Amino acid sequence: MSCQFVLAARRVVQFPPGMAGNVLRGALGSALRGALNPEDYAHIFEPAAREPGAIAGGPSGLSNWPRPFAIRCAALNGRILQPGDRFCFVVHLFDLRNSALDHFTQAFAQWAQLISVEQASVTVDLDARPSPVSRIRVEFQTPTELKSSDGDAKDFPVLLARARDRVSTLRSLYGPGPLEIDFRGVAERARSVKTVRSELRHVAVERRSRRTGQRHGIGGQVGFSEFEGDVAEFLPYLEAASFTGVGRHCTWGNGQIHTKILTPEF
């Protein structure tokens, strides 16, 4: 589900460059902690992997489960709001079995004046496209960090693996179950897709934890990469990733991607 929140500032609100997601993180966390019981708060804001192997068919080594939402707020970066100024952002919700939208609405209404909430159902067909596609461009619209010893955002197998695994994990925890696919086979076929053009730059951003005082890097690569090969099978995962985000800190607005189908160059 995609939800657009429109609010008006009650006081001066600053969104430093690259930090809009962190500002919303602080506001949402404080409001939810005060409004919800510990169990509901943990489910939304601090889901922990309580049982080994609980995510069947998904990636191993998860010490914390992904949160059941992703915020899209890049347009707020660098803005300074005065009292009464309107602003908006989008929250993609992945857990529709609980009252997450009500909790979010209550929390943001405590932080600012709530004007409206518009919601729309989102469905992505994960079946391969029927028509062949041989060249695509993936735009990394917000800083994207893909942790891998095998490569980074310009390497298609790495990008595809992160997008596929995030979709499967979210389905396992909050939806109908993990992807029923041959993960190894998908990975093998993804290796045949080659990077033919890449214009990426690194954006350095840090946030300071209020709880520990430590600084954490939340930057990543922005720009685009173009890939060539038999990519029709993989497009649904990339389309889903445009809603879920991909890579580190995608809950807070990082890892926002958009995929375009290109005409092959001969």
Task: Please tell me what each predicted stretch does.
Residues M1-F266:
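RNA-interacting cores
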